[in-house]
């Protein structure tokens, strides 16, 4: 059968000597969708890298305004395709047309493209730093090679390799992108890539500034992240796949930014339960079951202190899980993966109190599942009992006392988020102060009195955290300009003549509004003259 074309070197063309083919599947009906997609082989990968390197060289002469124009034009083209994008993504993922796809994720996607455009145009993101007395100047700039992006299955727009936050950050920082689609939603990615390519041509970017393939063999993925032409890579997905990519990139000395597994611990203290038992139970289930629990910020590990009110809370949560309708999982592997995780958890001492089996539905599904374990058992098996289940699954850990809860916090692995619910009258303050210092260093984002599922696209956001949530605790995958720094190199100019400097490092502020650090002070002012302090 005729396979869909790939986008390589500024051309939609057939894959050369593909290694195979595949079809997307409608997970709500377990039916194969008609379009066929190629599994790219060595020739495609070689051409991707060569064209990506050429595009990186050409992008050096493209102004920040042109990059911003592209991102804004692309956002507009996505909006013009709303109906087709929503219909296609719904078929491929079973995510709700409304509000999820049309009213939440698509506006988030176009919004972050526009925020990246604003950061590129304003230029403060590059952190221009000038020491006038010795004439040393530095700023962040592009990497000199393409950024390879591997998108996940759970966000067909907002984390898509060709439209998500990694894509927006890489382009805004001045890099071309090689996007590897997720095979769970190739049709959605094809539509997005067509819109991106149209915007490339409309705004005058190099033709290979955006390239896209649908799938490839694992060893070719390793080649992409480790090739000398590659600037950096970004991956969102499972820990096992992420670590294999990291190993390949590390051997070649190439940066790779990973978002992998996270169980997002939430500590719910006694005063909070006493004051808001039913309310918090409902919040927990709502957060855990959102999109069938297929969020990297799903609250999968809940810590409680032993007591009568706690047992009432456990009962309330159990009722929520038992009465909730199981959602549709994204792929055929989903139910089996949850079953495998439950085997690990129960073998380590956890007890299932709700669910625990595949749901009898038309699509891929698993019963909402709640487990419990004592704090003592958790401390005996902390590694196994922190295994992530990608679905509506939470483990309740009942600690004996605050000291044991603190000890539990100290053995947690790195997570994207961690939360603490406490009462509003100060009853839980002592316990909070015991736990918070331990939790703070284990998570990227610390929350109080709210569940972790939502991730706002704002400059102050950190969607990152210590290993194994990510590969480095110092970077965020969400928010501009912070997420752009992953895809930038620090360029220093020592005693370089003015006519050879980039505009951001000249005495004259190139925009009048750009923030620069001049002689140790952040300012928007220009430098009056060479060798003098700024005005």
Residue locations for each model-derived region?
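N-terminal Rossmann-like NAD(P)+-binding subdomain of aldehyde/semialdehyde dehydrogenases
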Residues: 1-135, 169, 529-534
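Conserved small-residue-rich beta-alpha loop and adjacent elements
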Residues: 18, 125-203, 392
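Residue-level signal for inorganic ion chemistry
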Residues: 30-31, 67, 89, 174, ...
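Conserved C-terminal structural/oligomerization subdomain of aldehyde/semialdehyde dehydrogenase
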Residues: 32-35, 204, 230, 302-304, ...
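Structural signal for hydrophobic packing residues in well-ordered secondary-structure cores
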Residues: 56, 60, 75-82, 86-89, ...
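ALDH superfamily catalytic-core signature
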Residues: 77, 195-202, 240-380, 407, ...
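A structured beta-alpha segment of the ubiquitous adenosine-cofactor-binding alpha/beta core
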Residues: 136-138, 211-234
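Hydrophobic/aromatic ligand-binding patch that stacks against planar heteroaromatic rings
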Residues: 168-171, 224, 248, 408, ...
């Amino acid at each position: 059968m005729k396979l869909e074309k790939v986008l390589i070197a500024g051309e939609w063309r057939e894959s050369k000597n593909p290694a195979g083919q595949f079809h997307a599947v409608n997970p709500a009906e377990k039916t194969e969708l008609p379009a066929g997609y190629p599994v790219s082989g060595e020739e495609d990968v070689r051409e991707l890298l060569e064209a990506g390197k050429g595009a990186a060289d050409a992008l050096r002469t493209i102004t920040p305004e042109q990059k911003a124009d592209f991102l804004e034009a692309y956002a507009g083209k996505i909006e013009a395709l709303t109906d087709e994008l929503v219909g296609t993504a719904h078929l491929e993922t079973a995510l709700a047309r409304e509000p999820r796809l049309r009213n939440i994720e698509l506006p988030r996607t176009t919004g972050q493209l526009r925020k990246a455009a604003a950061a590129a145009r304003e230029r403060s993101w590059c952190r221009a730093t000038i020491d006038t007395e010795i004439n040393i100047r530095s700023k962040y700039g592009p990497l000199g090679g393409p950024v390879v992006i591997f998108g996940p299955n759970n966000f067909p727009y907002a984390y898509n390799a060709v439209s998500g936050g990694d894509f927006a950050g890489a382009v805004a920082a001045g890099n071309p992108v090689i996007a590897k689609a997720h095979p769970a939603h190739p049709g959605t990615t094809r539509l997005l890539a067509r819109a991106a390519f149209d915007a490339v041509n409309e705004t005058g970017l190099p033709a290979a500034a955006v390239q896209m393939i649908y799938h490839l063999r694992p060893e070719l993925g390793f080649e992409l992240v480790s090739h000398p032409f590659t600037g950096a890579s970004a991956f969102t997905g499972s820990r096992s796949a992420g670590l294999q990519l990291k190993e390949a990139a590390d051997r070649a000395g190439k940066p790779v930014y990973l978002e992998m597994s996270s169980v997002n611990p939430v500590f719910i203290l006694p005063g909070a339960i006493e004051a808001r038992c039913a309310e918090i139970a409902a919040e927990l289930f709502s957060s855990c079951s959102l999109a069938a629990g297929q969020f990297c910020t799903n609250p999968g590990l809940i810590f409680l202190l032993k007591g009568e009110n706690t047992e009432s809370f456990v009962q309330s949560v159990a009722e929520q899980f038992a009465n909730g309708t199981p959602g549709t999982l994204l792929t055929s592997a989903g139910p089996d993966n949850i079953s495998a995780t439950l085997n690990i958890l129960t073998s380590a001492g956890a007890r299932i109190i709700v669910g625990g089996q595949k749901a009898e539905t038309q699509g891929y599904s698993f019963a909402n599942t709640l487990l419990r374990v004592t704090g003592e058992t958790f401390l005996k098996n902390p590694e196994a009992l922190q295994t992530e289940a990608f679905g509506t699954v939470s483990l309740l850990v009942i600690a004996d006392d605050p000291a044991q809860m603190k000890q539990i916090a100290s053995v947690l692995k790195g997570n994207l988020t961690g939360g603490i619910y406490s009462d509003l009258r100060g009853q839980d303050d002592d316990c909070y102060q015991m736990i918070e210092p331990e939790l703070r260093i284990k998570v990227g984002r610390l929350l109080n009195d709210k569940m972790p599922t939502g991730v706002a696209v704002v400059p102050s956001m950190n969607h990152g955290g210590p290993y194994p949530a990510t590969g480095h605790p110092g970077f965020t995958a969400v928010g501009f300009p912070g997420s752009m720094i992953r895809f930038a190199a620090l360029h220093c100019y020592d005693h370089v003549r003015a006519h050879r400097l980039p505009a951001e490092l000249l005495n004259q502020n190139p925009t009048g509004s750009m923030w620069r650090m001049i002689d140790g002070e952040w300012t928007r002012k220009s430098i009056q003259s060479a060798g003098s302090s700024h005005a």
